[in-house]
Amino acid sequence: MANHANAMNKVKILVVGDSGVGKSSLVHLICHGQCLSNSSWTIGCSVEVRVHEYREGTPSQRPYFVELWDVGGSNSHKNARHVFYNPVHGIILVHDLTNRKSQQNLRRWLSEILLREGGGTKSRIPLVDDFDAEQFGGFSQLPVFVVGTKQEQVAEFRTSGRVRSSSIADECAADEITVNTLDQRSLAPGSSNAVRLSRFFDKVIERQQTTTSRTDGGFSYLERENPMFRRNKATSSFVVTG
């Protein structure tokens, strides 16, 4: 019973985006409340853990370990990084507000996670450039959070104090924040950004509680969430159902 409780008291969130957008700095700020002084390129994957109080301030409050899996964005490792994708309970998509291409590439990151989760020969499936969230049945049930970094370098923010939401956030019905990872006030306790992030963590935990209470039916997590994709167990290939 104790082992089962420990397994239930943690969730895994993928933090993905192009190289150089500031994923490692963001994860460090989330987990430690401090700015990362010396950032370096992530090779493979780096994992940091934050203790999150689920449903804080309510009778249901309880601590959860939130594992943030910072996946390296280098194209040279794109054929191997799918090993980090199974299982997944939530996704944080990170883009550089000064680099529009990094925002556009978030669609490729989503399709990579959805199509490659679970490993095997699925890694040979080509990425989907024109990702459409509506075509993935049940995808909206997998919590997604979008973060735009380098807020301080955006002229729109300097003049109005706001940055318009990204199209990918709208398409996925995901919440979104913009941050300056060089300023710890970006995620200061009680701030709007911190509250939104906390709500996202709660959603991830609630989703994990729901999915772990179901039988898997022989399919991986994202195959269950996206019934249009079903893996042929004999050939390890995907077939479309329904």
Each PLM stretch: what is its role?
Residues 1-212, 240-242:
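TRAFAC-class small GTPase G-domain
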Residues 225-242:
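Extreme C-terminal disordered tails of eukaryotic proteins encode short linear targeting/docking signals used
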Residues 7, 76, 219, 225-228:
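Coiled-coil-like amphipathic alpha-helices with heptad-repeat character
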Residues 210-224:
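Intrinsically disordered, low-complexity regulatory segments enriched in Ser/Pro/Gln/Gly
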Residues 23-26, 94, 219, 225, ...:
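Generic N-terminal initiation segments characterized by hydrophobic and/or small/turn-forming residues
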